[in-house]
Amino acid sequence: MNNNKSVTLIFGAYFSHKHIYRTCKNLNKKFKIIVVENSLDKKFKQEIEKKYKNTKVIIPEKNVGLAKSYNIGIQNSKTKYVYLNCPDIDISNKSLDELVDCAEKLKNFCILAPNFKNVSIFANYSGNKYISKKTPSKIFRI
């Protein structure tokens, strides 16, 4: 397994405190976490940074939206890789380790993302009819 310090999880959030707390609790403390909290809730920042030393909460001057939140998080990251995530999507320690290992093996890539394994929840998205069977697929499965 790779060094956990080489990836930062970045969350763009708006009053997603419950989800952020759950992620911080469940992830290895060696992973860095940056939350750009658009609710401007300074109390949340103080509480979570005190409880989880690997977590940094950035509060912009106003609600900047998801895309700019990610950009702010990326600008404040000091690790080799970043993982952009929404607060209500769970990711495991193993998945993050595997993504970093995969990134180290591939070296030349633009975007690397995990596969969603529970397709029964989103069955209407599986087998996308708009993707031709002839479409070349360069998917690296981990």
In which residue ranges do the predicted regions lie?
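Short aromatic/hydrophobic "clamp" motif used to bind/position activated sugar donors
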Residues: 82
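Short, well-formed alpha-helical segments that are part of the catalytic scaffolds
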Residues: 13-29
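Glycine-rich, basic loop-to-helix element that forms the pyrophosphate-binding segment
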Residues: 60-77
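Cell-envelope/extracellular polymer assembly enzymes that use nucleotide-activated donors
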Residues: 6-8, 32
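The conserved acidic donor/metal-binding loop of glycosyltransferases
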Residues: 86-90
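A conserved acidic beta->alpha catalytic loop
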Residues: 37-45
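Conserved donor NDP-sugar-binding/catalytic core segment of glycosyltransferases
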Residues: 94-126
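Short alpha-helix within the catalytic core of nucleotide-sugar-dependent glycosyltransferases
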Residues: 45, 71, 79, 93-104
